[in-house]
C-alpha cells in the first residue's frame, strides 16, 4: 500500500479489525520509509448484474441511481436517509443473490416498489407514477385502488 505522506510503496499492518457493520476491514498501517501511520479500508469487490433498459440498452448497476430515485419518491416524507440506505442494501443483496448476469429494469422497479410499499405508501405511489408512466388519472386511480386492497 502506497504511503500518502511520502509515496513509498511498502507499509506494514499494525492493527486490523472489522469496520462498523462488518462490511469492510479497517487497517492501521505504518510506512516502512517515513514511519508515519495511516488508515485504509478494504471492501469486497461486489459483482452486480447489468441493468437491461426498456429500449434494450445495458448499463452497469449504479447504487446512486437507486438511492436518488428512492430519495426523490420519499421527498418531504418521514423516511430517514438510514431507512433508504437499508432499502438499497437489501436490494443490492437481492441482486447479488439472484445470480443473474443481467436484470431488467422492470424487475428492479417491482423490487423497489415492494420495498417502498412497506415503508411509505405515498412514496410508493410517487415511485409507481414515474416507473409505470401513468398516461391518465384512471391508471393512477387503479394503482391507488390496488394499494388500498393490499
From Swiss-Prot:
Transmembrane residue ranges: none
Record domain ATP-cone: where: 49-139
GO MF annotation list: ATP binding; DNA binding; zinc ion binding
Coiled-coil residue windows: none
One example of a Gene Ontology biological process annotation: negative regulation of DNA-templated transcription
Keyword rRNA-binding: no
Chain positions of all zinc fingers (unnamed): 3-34
Cofactor binding note: Binds 1 zinc ion.
Keyword ATP-binding: yes
Reported cofactor(s): Zn(2+)
Protein purpose: Negatively regulates transcription of bacterial ribonucleotide reductase nrd genes and operons by binding to NrdR-boxes.
Family named by the database record: Belongs to the NrdR family.
Name of this protein: Transcriptional repressor NrdR
Organism (species): Citrifermentans bemidjiense (strain ATCC BAA-1014 / DSM 16622 / JCM 12645 / Bem) (Geobacter bemidjiensis)
Amino acid at each position: 500500500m502506497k504511503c500518502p505522506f511520502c509515496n513509498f510503496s511498502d507499509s506494514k499492518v499494525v492493527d486490523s479489525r472489522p469496520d462498523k457493520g462488518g462490511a469492510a476491514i479497517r487497517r492501521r498501517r505504518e510506512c516502512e520509509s517515513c514511519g508515519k501511520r495511516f488508515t485504509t479500508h478494504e471492501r469486497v469487490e461486489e459483482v452486480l448484474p447489468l441493468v437491461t433498459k426498456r429500449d434494450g440498452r445495458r448499463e452497469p448497476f449504479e447504487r446512486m441511481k437507486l438511492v436518488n430515485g428512492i430519495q426523490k419518491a420519499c421527498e418531504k416524507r418521514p423516511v430517514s436517509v438510514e431507512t433508504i440506505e437499508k432499502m438499497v442494501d437489501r436490494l443490492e443483496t437481492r441482486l447479488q443473490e439472484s445470480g443473474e448476469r443481467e436484470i431488467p429494469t422492470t424487475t428492479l422497479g417491482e423490487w423497489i416498489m415492494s420495498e417502498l410499499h412497506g415503508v411509505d405508501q405515498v412514496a410508493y405511489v410517487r415511485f409507481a407514477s414515474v416507473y409505470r408512466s401513468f398516461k391518465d388519472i384512471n391508471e393512477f386511480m387503479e394503482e391507488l385502488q390496488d394499494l388500498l386492497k393490499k
